[in-house]
Structure formats: C-alpha cells, structure tokens
C-alpha cells in the first residue's frame, strides 16, 4: 500500500523531533560542551595540580567536620553552595570563608537550569551571589550548574556576565556501587585523577557519610602521588599565566 506524502512528511517530522530532542539531551548533560562561553571540566597542564570541589550545603555539623579535615591536611577547596541552604546556614558559609576556602554558586534552588526563563536563571544566580557576599566572600564567584545541566539560556547568561561554567572530570560518588564504600571512592579517585583534574564530591547530606570519610584518604593518596591542591580560581590562573615549560589551556571537545 502506498504511503501518502502527508504521512511521509509526518514521519520525517517525528523522526527529526526525536533526533533534536536526543541531541539536546546529550548537550544538556555534557561536561565538555556548551553553545556559549567557556566550559571547564579540567585544565590541560603538565603540572600535578588538582582542584577539590564540594557541591551543595552548607550543612551544620558536616561543614565543621570537613573543614577540620581540610585544615589538618593544609588543603584549600572550592564549595559550590546552594543559595537556599546558605540562607538557612549563613554562619556555616562564613566559617568556610574564614578558613580560606572559596564559595561558588550552585543556584538558589538547585533546580535543573534547562527549559527555564531568562528571569528565573538570572534570579537563581544573582540571589545566590548576594548570599555569598553576605557570608563575607569577596573574590570572584564561580558557577556550577545543578546536575551539570545546561542548554542555551544558562550558558548565554554566564557568557554575558563573563563567567565560565565549571564542571568536573572526576566524580566518584556518582556511581552507587562506589558511593557506598569510602575505600572504593578513594581508589576510584586516585585511578581517574590526572594533572589538571577537577574532583567533585557530595558530602553535605545524610547518606553521604562514605564520601566524607573518603576525603582524607583522597588527599593523602594524591599527595603521595605528587599532587598539590588548588582552588578553582588558582586552577584558572594557570590558564592565564602558565609557568615555563608547562602547557595550560581550556580543553576543547574532550
């Protein structure tokens, strides 16, 4: 039986729509590509440097325990905090700043920043920026999207406001079979880390105790491998002023 031209056209439209949707989904979760501005999952460098980053919170109790570990090991980290959590726990944010760490913006509500209006995106970021300033943080505020999700409007806003999208290339506690065991988290991190890596850990909530337990082992293990720890800002400085003999540049299409 002959298929009418109208049916054929409809099928083509459906197939095209599916393809576009699939492509948009893939792009939205990519840690290495976006339509506007710079996205930084890591930096390419020969230097054995890494950035240790923590998402969510700040959470009373956990924050103090984590700061104690970092202080003991002499490591500075970058905390991508949720605005609503910071608003409830502003003193925790002040403790992070007082200890010499960086505060980054992880939006106010931690909603996926796709299919959102420009005004919503702007409000989520600017509201959290204001809270970060209230916590006493005065340096550049870096941004990481919740779940790493972005499509068009978020990267456009960040580009327009001269911000890079900070993602990551090592996230051990995203795998359930690894996240349940601190030793596995440590082993996975040591295996996957390379010069210029940005490590992401989630330690701020109940159920993430194993991730918190893994922090010291990760630091000790990487130090033993010759790595030093930098904040995200310090990693980006390597891009601006690469030391003699080193190569440092934004990754493209990794």
Go through the PLM ranges and name each one:
Residues 67-76, 102, 118-152, 156-160, ...:
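CE4/NodB-like, metal-dependent polysaccharide N-deacetylase domain
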Residues 9-24:
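Hydrophobic membrane-insertion alpha-helices, especially the h-region
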Residues 54, 81-83, 105-107, 145-147, ...:
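A cross-domain feature marking catalytic cores of carbohydrate-active enzymes
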Residues 149, 155-192, 226-238:
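His/Asp/Glu-enriched short active-site or ligand-binding loop at hydrolase and phosphoryl-transfer sites
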Residues 1-6:
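N-terminal Lys/Arg-rich, disordered targeting/topogenic segments
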Residues 35-46, 72-74, 87, 209-254:
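C-terminal domain-boundary segment and adjacent tail
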Residues 111-116, 174-176, 201-202:
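A short acidic, helix-capping loop that chelates divalent metal ions and anchors anionic groups
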Residues 28-116, 120, 124-127, 131, ...:
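Active-site beta->alpha N-cap acidic-glycine motif
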């Amino acid at each position: 039986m002959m298929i009418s031209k109208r049916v054929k056209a409809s099928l083509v439209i459906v197939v095209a729509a599916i393809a576009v949707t699939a492509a948009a989904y893939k792009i939205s979760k990519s840690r290495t590509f976006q339509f506007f501005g710079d996205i930084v999952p890591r930096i390419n460098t020969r230097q054995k440097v890494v950035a240790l980053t923590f998402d969510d919170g700040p959470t009373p109790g956990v924050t103090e325990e984590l700061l104690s570990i970092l202080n003991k090991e002499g490591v500075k980290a970058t905390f991508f905090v949720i605005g609503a959590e910071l608003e409830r726990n502003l003193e925790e944010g002040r403790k992070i700043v007082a200890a010499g760490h960086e505060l980054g913006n992880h939006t106010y509500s931690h909603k996926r920043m796709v299919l959102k209006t420009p005004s919503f995106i702007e409000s989520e970021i600017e509201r959290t920026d204001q809270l970060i300033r209230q916590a006493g943080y005065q340096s550049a505020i870096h941004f990481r999207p919740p779940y790493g999700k972005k499509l068009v409007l978020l990267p456009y806003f960040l580009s327009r406001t001269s911000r890079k999208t900070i993602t990551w290339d090592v996230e051990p506690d995203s795998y359930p079979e690894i996240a349940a065991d601190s030793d596995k988290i440590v082993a996975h991190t040591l295996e996957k880390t390379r010069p210029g890596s940005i490590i992401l850990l989630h330690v701020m909530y109940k159920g993430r105790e194993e991730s918190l337990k893994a922090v010291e082992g990760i630091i000790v293990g990487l130090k033993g491998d010759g790595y030093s720890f930098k904040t995200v800002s310090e990693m980006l400085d390597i891009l601006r002023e690469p030391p003699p003999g080193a190569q440092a540049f934004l990754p493209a299409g990794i």
